[in-house]
Regions:
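C-terminal helical subdomain
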Residues: 41-42, 61-103, 107
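Catalytic loop of short-chain dehydrogenase/reductase
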Residues: 1-20, 26, 30-33
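Conserved SDR Rossmann-fold cofactor-binding beta-strand/turn motif
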Residues: 38-48
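Conserved sequence/active-site signature of Rossmann-fold short-chain dehydrogenase/reductase
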Residues: 33, 47-48, 52, 97-99
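Short glycine/proline- and charge-enriched loop/turn segments
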Residues: 52-62
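Intrinsically disordered, low-complexity acidic/proline-/asparagine-rich linker or regulatory tail/stalk regions
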Residues: 108-114
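Active-site loop/turn elements of alpha/beta-hydrolase fold enzymes
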Residues: 1, 44, 51
Length: 114
């Protein structure tokens, strides 16, 4: 989850941008809550999309099946949008139960020379 942790899979620019988006979302809520404007930072872990094919060691089909799916993210966005006006979901983390970063598999996707 690049918006929460620094890691080698996503790279410097992507991770920095994700951190900035979280700060922007918090700033929107801070500056505009009195106007009824709200923002939610949706922070997904690994989502099974084609972008994973660009990794040096793409995850297997079995690993992808265990990841958050595009439909899961869509359902979460709908949930956020359907909240009543008096509710602000500031930040939501959505990760798979079988989380590769917890079990160390994500670290194996980065080739290391050490």
């Amino acid at each position: 989850m690049a918006s929460q942790r620094v890691g080698g899979v996503s790279g410097i620019a992507y991770t920095s941008a994700k951190h900035a988006l979280n700060a922007m979302s918090e700033s929107i809520n801070h500056e505009n809550c009195h106007l009824g404007i709200r923002a939610c930072a949706l922070c997904p872990g690994e989502v099974a999309t084609e972008i994973l094919d660009l990794r040096p060691a793409p995850p297997s089909a079995e690993e992808r099946a265990r990841m958050v799916q595009e439909e899961d993210v869509g359902a979460t966005i709908l949930f956020i949008a359907q909240m009543p006006p008096h509710v602000c979901l500031n930040e939501i983390h959505i990760t798979p139960t079988w989380n590769r970063s917890y079990i160390g598999a994500a670290d194996r996707t980065i080739p290391r020379d050490d």
